[in-house]
């Protein structure tokens, strides 16, 4: 693992890793040892209503050290990386531990983010109404350079590219090519990339989802049911569609559990793929 005594207390710490790899516990350990705050860099943990299902820190963990940008976005709102950078900025002076599994957030933080106009609600609704396959086909035609850059299996990345192309008439790849300097260059941080063994991680994913069910994930989904149809990014929480399907009576709980575990493992696979391509300059932390 990591010897915390070797971490420079004068630099922000970045921790990236696939879901269920132990990022939260490491972040808290570093924050406790060095008197830091923990700041979220997970695009799903920003939403209220999903504490259990998105594996946000527990109330006890939040009491142990200050935590920020967890559950601060309304369930029905849309939230993007530009808003996250704005929300993060006030905490940078505190040399925080920035932790999460959203590679786009870390790339924007350390490499810069293009100043793209906001997406109008009608364009977003149009994007939501199209299938992933349709959006990807449009991108192949309108922004092939972006298709070569992104994980095309990630619906959020594909939809973002589609929305920018539709709203601005200009490819997202062209906007990205004009990216300004980063808010926090990687060289000014201690960047840690957790690299878990696949079989070890897959077992943890199954165990953790069962633990989530025991700790009330289904009750959490039931509480969110009345606003599910108007959910923004919160609807993309891994395991949420499966639990909602069970509550609608279209999927037995055992099948919902298995489907959610499979979806989580697929998500972790995409995260590991992103890390292999984007964290060569980070300190690799093999696990277990």
Swiss-Prot record:
- Name of this protein: tRNA dimethylallyltransferase
Q: Which organism is it from?
A: Jannaschia sp. (strain CCS1)
The answer to whether UniProt assigns keyword Ribosomal protein to this entry is: no
Q: Where does substrate bind?
A: 19-24
Encoded by which gene?
A: miaA
Top EC class, one word: transferase
The positions making up the signal sequence are: none
Q: So where does ATP get bound? A: 17-24
Q: Which reaction does it catalyse?
A: adenosine(37) in tRNA + dimethylallyl diphosphate = N(6)-dimethylallyladenosine(37) in tRNA + diphosphate
Q: Which GO terms describe its biological process?
A: tRNA modification
Question: What does the annotation say about its assembly with partners?
Answer: Monomer.
